């Protein structure tokens, strides 16, 4: 399997502060091998799986595993904690404005050979996020102790194309990555 970029091309693009999506792919017709790989990877901290399903029964086109986020944004009240490879920074701000800006700035050109979800921000918004939009009483006890919002930026994705029986190994190198 060959990677899609030479070392010189990579260095040149990175020096220009460009996001890069490095990948390699191969045909993999035995799905049980893919399932075994996924079971292994899902044991990793901060990993996730997206399984596309149609009409609740039929397996959809893609199975996506994401792992090794280089940044995680946690929102609690008006404090955003940014965890970049274990170094945490806190920012006091209006979370929804910050998140909208974050999403707008996440603009990565995906190579044509890859599925469109080959680079992503992923996360969740809890029910309590409504309190950032509307003034409603907060009488609930926070017994779960989870962030109101969590967004992560996975460096690695493994995507299996169920139609083409092809697996993609993807490494996202973001412009702010030190190499």
Report residues per predicted region.
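Signature of the chorismate-utilizing enzyme
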Residues: 1-179
């Amino acid at each position: 399997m060959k990677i899609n970029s030479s070392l010189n091309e990579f260095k040149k693009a990175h020096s220009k502060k460009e996001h890069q999506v490095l990948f390699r792919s191969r045909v993999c017709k035995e799905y049980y091998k893919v399932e075994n790989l996924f079971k292994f990877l899902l044991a990793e901290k901060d990993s996730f799986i997206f399984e596309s399903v149609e009409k609740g029964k039929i397996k959809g086109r893609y199975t996506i595993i994401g792992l090794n986020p280089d940044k995680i944004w946690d929102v609690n009240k008006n404090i955003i904690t940014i965890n970049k490879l274990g170094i945490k920074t806190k920012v006091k701000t209006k979370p929804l404005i910050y998140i909208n800006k974050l999403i707008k700035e996440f603009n990565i050109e995906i190579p044509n050979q890859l599925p469109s979800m080959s680079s992503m921000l992923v996360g969740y918004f809890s029910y309590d996020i409504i309190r950032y939009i509307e003034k409603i009483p907060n009488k609930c006890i926070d017994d779960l102790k989870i962030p109101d919002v969590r967004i992560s930026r996975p460096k690695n994705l493994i995507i299996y194309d169920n139609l083409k029986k092809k697996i993609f190994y993807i490494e996202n190198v973001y412009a702010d990555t030190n190499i």
